[in-house]
Amino acid sequence: RKFNNGGNRKTKGALVATGCIVGVFVLTNAVLVASVLVPYGLGLPNYCGIGLYLLLSTGMVFFCLAGRTLRQEVRMTFEVTDRSVEEGRRQVARIVGRDTSNLSAQEVRTAALETLAENLSDGVVAPLFWMLLLGVPGMMTYKMVNTLDSMIGYRTERYERFGCWAAKIDDYANYIPARLTALLIVFAEKLMRWKRTSVKWLMGFVGRYGSQHASPNSGWPEAALAGVLDCQFGGGHNYFGVYFYKPFIGDYPRLLTTADMWRSLQIAMAVEMMMVGLMLLVMLIG
């Protein structure tokens, strides 16, 4: 708020975003190096430094991953919406940025599954992807990139200029992970054998709708999940009092059910396990 006023908001926003991102990368590296060197400097056995390093690294990894929490929130959203639309609106507001005060039960459920798909990329696949490339510091740095985007990367009058750099960095950081997430969703569905459609058809569906989203990345995992469920995502929503239209993803605007929620959660779990397996495979080969 201190920097987001007056002139040169775009430059100020770029400096703030760059400073935060570089700062997290440097600080994380420094902390992890110190966790090994400090015990050694104090004359402690080597395993003390190694143990501290592993403890801190593990804590950072779990801090960056949001798969379990997201699945719980989505499940709770469907459960409370079955009881009361008003409760569902309050629950889904915990995981989406849009105005939920006037959403119907169908829109609440749709918002929850859209968020599950999008954050399967942002909260699981992308952090692990950047960990694979740049280690734990890369994972923590990605977390900062994603956090900045969720805080200031909005196309509103207040943040359009100040947050544009943060939003652009987030777009670049998620470009490969978003498409990888869509691919993993398709493969996860094929492993579960829910649909008789081919991988080629599903990939064609993803390619047709993934690029139509207002975001260059969010549409890909959302299109993959919509294709798996035979449903429709998208439509207009209010964000901080501003109306945004998102093109529809899918051709079948049917009502979503609890069965769709459970299928989506199973897909999410499968994608997480496949991504971890892919990481281990690359590390072994490398």
Where are the language model's segments positioned?
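Hydrophobic alpha-helical transmembrane segments
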Residues: R1-M140, G153-G286
